[in-house]
């Protein structure tokens, strides 16, 4: 065993030894050690290779550790530098000494010099082929251990050479960049040497901005724009002081200059091109050497201006840039989105931590004492029908250094626009129902223009500020407000604020505060007002005829441009055009000193109307109906016959408010108070332009200062009286608005009831004020003194130019009329609408073909005197501007109180007034002719809007009953047809009254001078004007507004004015078609169509809707479908305020009170329907519901001047309201009545057919309910071009009612013929258009042609045209007649006689007979219904189917029988009254809704009161007086009076204005008697 075990062990050992031997043998070979090390390294490297993710993770961890380590030693610094180099893909190595670290690439290297302790010594950068150059910026970064910034520089250097090609090509590209940088640096030095500009000047104006040379990895930087907010420290809110050594790189907007590879080849200079060191011209343009092959090279690269963040630019900007550089901006076509959406994203992305914000384009701004909500209407259509599109631009290509200054200027322009829009974009979140939250709508008008619409700070109306970014440092601003709106501030003030802050919220806050300060300053003017009032009482000028504004009635439409659109110049022969032109609100009107004087002096206006327009107006006795007398005799001609006129012309110039406050943009503003679009609408009405140029919306502005002062004073005196509230509202705006604003604002609801008690004294006072002409030098002196004092007064804002102008604007828009309308308005109270006669006044205006226009000129204020506006204006806008300039408006504070009242009632109470009654009576006959008022009322606007519209075209709305009618007549006498004006806007007394007033004056001045006198004696005319204010009680507003409006601006009733022939339009009862308007509908369309219907409409609680109804009643049936569409459209867009259709839709209430179903809608009164819709919108704020109480909105007010379109625009942006339709309103409003489709058609119609046709077209297009409204106003053009513009305006704004001027008598006749009346109030604009048809006051059936847009009635209209083809007194009126297309609903035909009686009572002569087509439904007055169908509610004749009571008929206006209270009087004018009633009745829902400030309850109460009064009046007046609810039902109310009474406001104020049926009834006879007997 042992041996065996040993053997095994030995074997093992041997085996092991053999293995060891083999191992030893193997590894004993000669293998070098280096080989072994290499093998180990390879093994180690293979192990290190891990997944790429893991590797990156480790690297990031190492870098994080590196950053966390403090660099305090040389090794730590070199390690960090090497780490940074690796991060940027660069190589790095250390010098032998270890104190230099080199970071390298193929094209450059960076040398970092350190000391042994690791401290930095220097940093040098060496580009390819160059010596290293020290870079101070990199030295600073590394010394501060700011390694992140150092890394950015390295990245920039890498990107600089991120070019195609080899190193040689890259070197050439670098040389090209260097040469460009040298040239740009020379340009910067040249600019600095030439201007010694500070850093901020370089940024904003420098040819290459503030230039920072390329340094390290930072490219050459051009700082080209910095907004004021950029210059505030974000943390401390303290201003950043810029100096050469302290201009933060991140400040403002920057662009870097670089070169990048491109797919195309470009010849780029590789050597500097600038020769010498001095500029070649005074624009700092250097002289460049030519680009040749010697100094340039073709490279696959180009120069670029690159932006840190892509900039939103408009489509137009892209095209301009490409035209400038000659190089496509994008290699592939970009995707275009709404520009405002891009701007919103751009602004929100500035937040360092941008979180998604669900804004829906609604943003909130919390400012000291105010909270704003801004709705950016990104989809609003531009004039071309497209929304404002844009795209993002991140870089701009260019080849030559000389292109850089041009590019920078273009970018600055775009960025300035973006800055303003972006100022609304905040991340602030507020609750929708936050108390006091103010709504604003920002809507694009073009690539450089936009509008901001908001509620008037004082009045319940829509105001629009149009901002035009002319360049990066100049922003022109224009405030569009209702003529009767209180003063807000001047355009210059707004422009200064905008340019100082470049922020919309800050500007809106400043505007509001400015309005408040102006309002606060009003009381200081009370003493002056009293003095002026006394003077007026002692020196009452003769009542002036409505011809004043008409002087340019036939003026061809000179091309007018509105912020939004440009209307092609074209002859708009009728007043209508003038109305539109009025809008000259452009202010472009500058026919001469005389004209401005005219526009400034209501008295002067009335005088001119009487002398010059008497013939030209439809019913003017001198001119045969078929003649379209020269637009009104030239001013010179008119002045020859009137010494007083001569005096006014002499005195006014120097003391003209325009002159006194001429510098103040307010005047210009007010003159262009119409919506931006309205301006476009305003056509060639030179007279209007003249008048409106200064203060289209505020005639009084144009009035002599005396007039302005008187009205202001009277307003002041009356301010204590409730009636004054309403009255003042309208007047204050017209006049300098010294007293009106306060009184208006001061007396709230109480004013409505009170008006009746105080009306007479107040009104008389007011009347005298309006007839400040008689005051002459005394008043002028006083005014001038006031103006001087005002200018001396410390302005609330330094920015504000002389406030006098604004004040004046205010007054012009409301003051004059305010005085005229105030008393009446108050007298009228609920039932007595001083406006009742306003319808008559308007009728008178209609009587003269040109009268409408002049009246419009004169009464644009009146028309614009929506009670709301006046009240609110006096409170804020009116008072503010005026006070800023001077403390003339002592009563502004008073008005403040009244404003809410008036707004609530919408001037209903104002309509009724004891004095107002008689005055209206006087004008009540004229009312018959002034059916256009109804048309105006037809406007979708609420009472205020209606009032405005009405008073412009007709005062039917105003009529609250017989009493109201009588008032209107008297008013008319006093106020040259102001009565008609006042009649127009019971609901929105102030505004509509103003509007009405302009048209009314035109038509009425001629016809109504005698009545005026009568009214003056009553002392109501001036106050009548006031009644138009939106705030005035509905009843009061209706009556007082129209008469006051016309009377105030023209001449006081007391003054002995050359007799003005009365024009009565007799319409067979059978002709009138009765509609069944719902009694409560805003404006019953049916009432408008038929006398009976009109009246019933009037009886509607809401006079404004009544009015619309009246005018549309006849029309309704034929155009039900149209109306409904229109209605809908209107509703969506503030239509109610801005569209006659809106009212009409209510009038259409015949069809159930639904806008869509309303008969008016059918005819194009659909606008009226929209008005109805508007009402609901009104809830958010008056802004939202301009048509209801917004009629007073500044843009709307300007409607009388022709800015109705503009108004529409402002109206459209109601933040609270759905933006869809409205949002578009501002853009399209001006050019066409309807915001969208309607607009274009409306404009086209207007231009083609005179004003008349446009309205019709509008109405025809349901989608264009807004357009309908504008169109209508143009239809009013027969004698009231203004109507058309109003209509457009109203459509867009809902204030268009005020826009409708009084149509000429011809227009009324035309309406009667065609039964177009139906559209009257309801589709204020549509009616206007029909009125336009009617407006061929000359009795031309031709007006139907103009109304062609209503296709249905066109043929009929044309027939009428044949009958009346010769009646072109209105100029455009004949064309208006053409609108018969809408008449086709009228089944039977009647003959309407136009009776023109002389003021002295001479036997009346029948100037023309018109065949009336009666809608199947119309009972007696075919004319009326047909006109309604044509929706010429704007025209007095059409409005009132009853011939006698046509607005144009002075006798009717004068007729004492027609008391404002008397519904019967109103019923005489029948449909006219109905229309007027609709317009007048602030009580109308439409009117009420727009007045958020004024409780709807008050409005309703007012309406009820008005209804009660009207009912009483009707009962008294006629056995067949219908109850407010009943009258609308009867096709032809047994008694026109009854129908009128139905609408308390309307009936009282506009009895004569009722539908033809009613007129044909006893009313007709009465009116005829009055016309025959004389005033």
Swiss-Prot record:
<dbReference type="GO" id="GO:0140296">
    <property type="term" value="F:general transcription initiation factor binding"/>
</dbReference>
<feature type="region of interest" description="Disordered">
    <location>
        <begin position="737"/>
        <end position="760"/>
    </location>
</feature>
<dbReference type="GO" id="GO:0030224">
    <property type="term" value="P:monocyte differentiation"/>
</dbReference>
<dbReference type="GO" id="GO:0060218">
    <property type="term" value="P:hematopoietic stem cell differentiation"/>
</dbReference>
<feature type="region of interest" description="Interaction with TP53">
    <location>
        <begin position="1251"/>
        <end position="1423"/>
    </location>
</feature>
<feature type="region of interest" description="Disordered">
    <location>
        <begin position="874"/>
        <end position="895"/>
    </location>
</feature>
<feature type="compositionally biased region" description="Basic and acidic residues">
    <location>
        <begin position="696"/>
        <end position="706"/>
    </location>
</feature>
<dbReference type="GO" id="GO:0043066">
    <property type="term" value="P:negative regulation of apoptotic process"/>
</dbReference>
<feature type="modified residue" description="N6-acetyllysine">
    <location>
        <position position="1523"/>
    </location>
</feature>
<dbReference type="GO" id="GO:0033598">
    <property type="term" value="P:mammary gland epithelial cell proliferation"/>
</dbReference>
<feature type="region of interest" description="Interaction with the Mediator complex">
    <location>
        <begin position="108"/>
        <end position="212"/>
    </location>
</feature>
<feature type="short sequence motif" description="LXXLL motif 1">
    <location>
        <begin position="604"/>
        <end position="608"/>
    </location>
</feature>
<feature type="region of interest" description="Interaction with GATA1">
    <location>
        <begin position="622"/>
        <end position="701"/>
    </location>
</feature>
<feature type="compositionally biased region" description="Low complexity">
    <location>
        <begin position="1220"/>
        <end position="1258"/>
    </location>
</feature>
<dbReference type="GO" id="GO:0016922">
    <property type="term" value="F:nuclear receptor binding"/>
</dbReference>
<feature type="compositionally biased region" description="Basic and acidic residues">
    <location>
        <begin position="1354"/>
        <end position="1366"/>
    </location>
</feature>
<feature type="modified residue" description="Phosphothreonine">
    <location>
        <position position="805"/>
    </location>
</feature>
<dbReference type="GO" id="GO:0050693">
    <property type="term" value="F:LBD domain binding"/>
</dbReference>
<dbReference type="GO" id="GO:0046966">
    <property type="term" value="F:nuclear thyroid hormone receptor binding"/>
</dbReference>
<feature type="modified residue" description="Phosphoserine">
    <location>
        <position position="1225"/>
    </location>
</feature>
<feature type="region of interest" description="Interaction with ESR1">
    <location>
        <begin position="656"/>
        <end position="1066"/>
    </location>
</feature>
<feature type="region of interest" description="Disordered">
    <location>
        <begin position="791"/>
        <end position="818"/>
    </location>
</feature>
<feature type="region of interest" description="Interaction with THRA">
    <location>
        <begin position="405"/>
        <end position="644"/>
    </location>
</feature>
<dbReference type="GO" id="GO:2000347">
    <property type="term" value="P:positive regulation of hepatocyte proliferation"/>
</dbReference>
<dbReference type="GO" id="GO:0035035">
    <property type="term" value="F:histone acetyltransferase binding"/>
</dbReference>
<dbReference type="GO" id="GO:0005634">
    <property type="term" value="C:nucleus"/>
</dbReference>
<feature type="modified residue" description="Phosphothreonine">
    <location>
        <position position="1442"/>
    </location>
</feature>
<feature type="modified residue" description="Phosphoserine">
    <location>
        <position position="1465"/>
    </location>
</feature>
<feature type="modified residue" description="Phosphoserine">
    <location>
        <position position="1405"/>
    </location>
</feature>
<feature type="compositionally biased region" description="Polar residues">
    <location>
        <begin position="1331"/>
        <end position="1352"/>
    </location>
</feature>
<dbReference type="GO" id="GO:0033148">
    <property type="term" value="P:positive regulation of intracellular estrogen receptor signaling pathway"/>
</dbReference>
<dbReference type="GO" id="GO:0045444">
    <property type="term" value="P:fat cell differentiation"/>
</dbReference>
<dbReference type="GO" id="GO:0001223">
    <property type="term" value="F:transcription coactivator binding"/>
</dbReference>
<feature type="modified residue" description="Phosphoserine">
    <location>
        <position position="795"/>
    </location>
</feature>
<dbReference type="GO" id="GO:0042809">
    <property type="term" value="F:nuclear vitamin D receptor binding"/>
</dbReference>
<feature type="modified residue" description="Phosphoserine">
    <location>
        <position position="887"/>
    </location>
</feature>
<feature type="compositionally biased region" description="Basic residues">
    <location>
        <begin position="1498"/>
        <end position="1507"/>
    </location>
</feature>
<keyword id="KW-0217">Developmental protein</keyword>
<dbReference type="GO" id="GO:0006355">
    <property type="term" value="P:regulation of DNA-templated transcription"/>
</dbReference>
<feature type="compositionally biased region" description="Pro residues">
    <location>
        <begin position="622"/>
        <end position="632"/>
    </location>
</feature>
<dbReference type="GO" id="GO:0035162">
    <property type="term" value="P:embryonic hemopoiesis"/>
</dbReference>
<keyword id="KW-0597">Phosphoprotein</keyword>
């Amino acid at each position: 065993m042992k041996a065996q075990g040993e053997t095994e062990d030995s074997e093992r050992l041997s085996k092991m030894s053999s293995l060891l031997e083999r191992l030893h043998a193997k590894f004993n070979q000669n293998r070098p050690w280096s080989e072994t090390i290499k093998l180990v390294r390879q093994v180690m490297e293979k192990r290190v290779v891990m997944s790429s993710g893991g590797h990156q993770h480790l690297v990031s961890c190492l870098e994080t550790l590196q950053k966390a380590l403090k660099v305090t030693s040389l090794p730590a610094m070199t390690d960090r530098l090497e780490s940074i180099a690796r991060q940027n893909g660069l190589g790095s190595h250390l010098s032998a000494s270890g104190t230099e670290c080199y970071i390298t690439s193929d094209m450059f290297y960076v040398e970092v010099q350190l000391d042994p302790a690791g401290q930095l010594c220097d940093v040098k950068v060496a580009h390819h082929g160059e010596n290293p150059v020290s870079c101070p910026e990199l030295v600073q970064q590394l010394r501060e251990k700011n390694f992140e910034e150092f890394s950015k520089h390295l990245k920039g250097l890498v990107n600089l050479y991120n070019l195609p090609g080899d190193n040689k090509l890259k070197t050439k590209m670098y040389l090209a960049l260097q040469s460009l940088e040298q040239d740009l640096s020379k340009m910067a030095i040249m600019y600095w040497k030439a201007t010694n500009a500070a850093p901020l000047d370089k940024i904003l104006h420098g040819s290459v901005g503030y230039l920072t040379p390329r340094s390290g990895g930072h490219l050459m930087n051009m700082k080209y724009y910095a907004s004021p907010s950029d210059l505030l420290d974000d943390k401390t809110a303290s201003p950043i002081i810029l100096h050469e050594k302290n201009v933060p790189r991140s400040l403002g907007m920057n662009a870097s200059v670089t070169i990048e590879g491109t797919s195309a080849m470009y010849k780029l200079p590789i050597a500097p091109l600038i020769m010498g060191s001095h500029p070649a011209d005074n624009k700092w343009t250097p002289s460049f050497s030519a680009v040749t092959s010697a100094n340039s090279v073709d490279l696959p690269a180009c120069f670029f201006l690159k932006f840190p963040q892509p900039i939103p630019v408009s489509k137009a900007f892209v095209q301009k840039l490409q035209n400038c550089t000659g190089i496509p901006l994008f290699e592939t076509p970009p995707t275009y989105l709404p520009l405002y959406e891009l701007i919103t994203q751009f602004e929100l992305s500035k937040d360092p931590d941008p979180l998604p914000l669900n804004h829906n384009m609604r943003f909130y701004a919390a400012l000291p004492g105010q909270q704003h909500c801004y709705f950016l209407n990104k989809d609003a259509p531009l004039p071309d029908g497209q929304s404002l599109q844009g795209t993002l631009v991140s870089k701009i290509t260019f080849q030559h250094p000389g292109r850089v200054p041009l590019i920078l200027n273009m970018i600055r322009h775009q960025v300035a626009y973006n800055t303003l829009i972006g100022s609304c974009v905040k991340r602030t979140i507020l609750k929708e129902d936050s108390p006091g939250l103010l709504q604003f709508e920002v809507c694009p008008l073009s690539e450089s223009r936009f509008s901001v619409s908001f509620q008037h700070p004082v009045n319940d109306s829509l105001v629009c500020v149009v901002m035009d970014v002319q360049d990066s440092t100049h922003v022109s601003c224009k405030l569009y407000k209702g003529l009767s709106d209180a003063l807000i501030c001047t355009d210059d003030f707004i422009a200064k604020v905008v340019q100082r802050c470049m922020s919309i919220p800050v500007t809106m806050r400043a505007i509001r505060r400015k309005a408040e300060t102006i309002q606060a300053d009003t009381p200081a003017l009370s003493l002056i007002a009293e003095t002026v009032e006394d003077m007026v009482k002692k020196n009452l000028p003769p009542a002036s005829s409505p011809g004043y504004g008409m002087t340019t009635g036939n003026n061809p439409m000179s091309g007018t441009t509105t912020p939004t659109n440009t209307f092609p110049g074209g002859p708009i022969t009728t007043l209508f055009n003038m109305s539109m032109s009025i809008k000259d609100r452009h202010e472009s009107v500058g026919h001469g000193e005389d004209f401005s004087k005219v526009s400034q002096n209501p008295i002067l206006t009335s005088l001119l109307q009487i002398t010059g327009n008497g013939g030209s107006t439809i019913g003017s006795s001198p001119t045969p109906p078929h003649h379209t007398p020269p637009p009104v005799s030239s001013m010179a001609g008119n002045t020859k016959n009137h010494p007083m006129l001569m005096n006014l012309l002499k005195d006014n110039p120097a003391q003209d408010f325009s002159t006194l406050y001429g510098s103040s943009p307010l005047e210009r503003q007010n003159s262009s108070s119409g919506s931006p679009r309205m301006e476009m609408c305003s056509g060639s009405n030179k007279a209007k332009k003249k008048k409106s140029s200064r203060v289209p919306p505020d005639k009084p502005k144009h009035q002599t200062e005396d007039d302005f002062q008187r009205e202001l004073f009277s307003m002041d005196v009356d301010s204590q009286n409730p009636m004054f509230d309403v009255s003042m509202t309208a007047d204050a705006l017209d006049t300098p608005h010294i007293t009106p604003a306060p009184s208006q604002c001061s007396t709230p609801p109480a004013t409505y009831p009170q008006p009746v008690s105080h009306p007479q004294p107040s009104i008389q006072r007011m009347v005298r004020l309006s007839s400040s002409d008689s005051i002459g030098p005394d008043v002028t002196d006083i005014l001038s003194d006031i103006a001087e004092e005002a200018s001396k007064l410390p302005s609330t804002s330094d920015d504000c130019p002389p406030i006098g102008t604004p004040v004046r604007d205010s007054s012009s828009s409301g003051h004059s009329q305010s005085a005229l309308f105030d008393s009446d308005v108050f007298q009228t109270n609920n039932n007595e609408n001083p406006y009742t006669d306003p319808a008559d006044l308007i009728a008178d205006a209609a009587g003269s073909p040109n009268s409408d226009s002049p009246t419009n000129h004169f009464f644009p204020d009146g028309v614009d005197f929506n009670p709301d506006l006046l009240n609110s204006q006096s409170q804020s806008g009116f008072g503010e501007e005026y006070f800023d300039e001077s403390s003339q408006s002592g009563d502004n504070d008073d008005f403040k109180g009244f404003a809410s009242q008036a707004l609530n009632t919408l001037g209903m109470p104002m309509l009724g007034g004891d004095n107002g009654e008689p005055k209206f009576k006087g004008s009540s006959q004229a009312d018959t002719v002034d059916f256009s008022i109804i048309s105006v009322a037809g406007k979708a606007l609420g009472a205020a809007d209606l009032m405005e519209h009405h008073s412009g075209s007709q005062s039917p709305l105003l009529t609250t009953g017989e009493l109201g009618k009588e008032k209107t007549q008297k008013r008319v006498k006093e106020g040259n047809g102001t009565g008609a004006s006042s009649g127009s806007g019971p609901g929105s007394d102030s505004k509509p009254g103003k509007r009405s007033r302009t048209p009314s004056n035109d038509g009425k001045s001629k016809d109504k001078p005698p009545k005026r006198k009568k009214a003056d004696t009553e002392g109501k005319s001036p106050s009548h004007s006031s009644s138009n204010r939106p705030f005035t009680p509905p009843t009061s507003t209706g009556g007082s507004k129209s008469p006051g409006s016309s009377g105030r601006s023209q001449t006081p009733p007391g003054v002995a004015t050359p007799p003005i022939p009365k024009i009565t339009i007799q319409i067979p009862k059978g002709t009138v078609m009765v509609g069944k308007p719902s009694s409560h509908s805003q404006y019953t369309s049916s009432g408008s169509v038929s006398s009976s219907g009109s009246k019933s409409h009037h009886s509607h609680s809401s006079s404004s809707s009544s009015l619309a109804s009246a005018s549309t009643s006849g029309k309704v049936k034929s155009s039900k479908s149209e109306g409904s569409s229109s209605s809908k459209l209107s509703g969506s867009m503030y239509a109610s305020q801005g569209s006659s259709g809106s009212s009409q839709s209510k009038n259409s209430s015949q069809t159930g009170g639904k806008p869509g179903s309303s008969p008016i809608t059918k005819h194009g009164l659909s606008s009226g329907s929209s008005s109805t819709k508007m009402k609901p919108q009104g809830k958010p704020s008056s802004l939202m519901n301009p048509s209801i109480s917004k009629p007073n909105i500044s843009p709307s007010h300007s409607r009388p001047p022709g800015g109705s379109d503009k108004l529409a625009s402002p109206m459209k942006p109601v933040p609270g309201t759905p933006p869809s339709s409205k949002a578009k309103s501002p853009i399209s409003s001006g050019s066409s009545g309807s915001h969208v489709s309607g607009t274009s058609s409306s404009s086209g119609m207007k231009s083609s057919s005179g004003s008349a046709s446009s309205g019709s077209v509008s109405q025809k297009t349901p989608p264009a309910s807004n357009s309908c409204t504008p169109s209508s106003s143009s239809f009013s053009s027969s004698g009231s071009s203004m109507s058309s513009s109003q209509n457009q305006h109203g459509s867009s704004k809902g204030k268009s009612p005020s826009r409708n001027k009084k149509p000429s008598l011809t227009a009324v006749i035309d309406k009667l013929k065609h039964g177009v009346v139906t559209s009257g109030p309801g589709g204020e604009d549509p009616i206007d258009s029909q009125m336009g048809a009617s407006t061929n006051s000359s009795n031309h059936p031709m007006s139907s042609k103009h109304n062609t847009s209503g296709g249905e009635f066109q043929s009929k209209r044309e027939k009428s045209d044949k009958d009346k083809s010769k009646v072109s007194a209105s100029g455009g009126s004949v064309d208006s007649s053409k609108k018969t297309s809408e008449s086709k609903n009228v089944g039977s035909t009647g003959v309407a006689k136009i009776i023109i009686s002389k003021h002295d009572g001479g036997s009346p002569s029948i100037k023309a007979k018109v065949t009336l087509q009666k809608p199947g439904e119309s009972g007696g007055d075919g004319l009326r219904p047909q006109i309604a169908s044509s929706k010429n509610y704007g025209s007095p004749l059409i409005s009132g189917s009853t011939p006698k009571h046509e607005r144009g008929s002075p006798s009717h206006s004068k007729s004492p029988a027609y008391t404002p209270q008397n519904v019967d009087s109103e019923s005489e004018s029948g449909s006219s009254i109905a229309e007027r009633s609709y317009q007048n009745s602030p009580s109308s829902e439409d009117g009420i809704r727009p007045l958020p400030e004024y409780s709807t309850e008050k409005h309703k109460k007012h309406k009820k009161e008005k209804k009660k009064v009207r009912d009483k009046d009707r009962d008294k007046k006629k056995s067949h007086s219908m109850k407010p609810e009943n009258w609308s039902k009867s096709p032809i109310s047994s008694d026109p009076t009854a129908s009128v009474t139905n609408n308390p406001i309307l009936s009282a104020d506009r009895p004569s204005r009722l539908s033809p049926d009613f007129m044909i009834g006893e009313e007709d006879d009465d009116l005829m008697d009055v016309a025959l007997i004389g005033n």
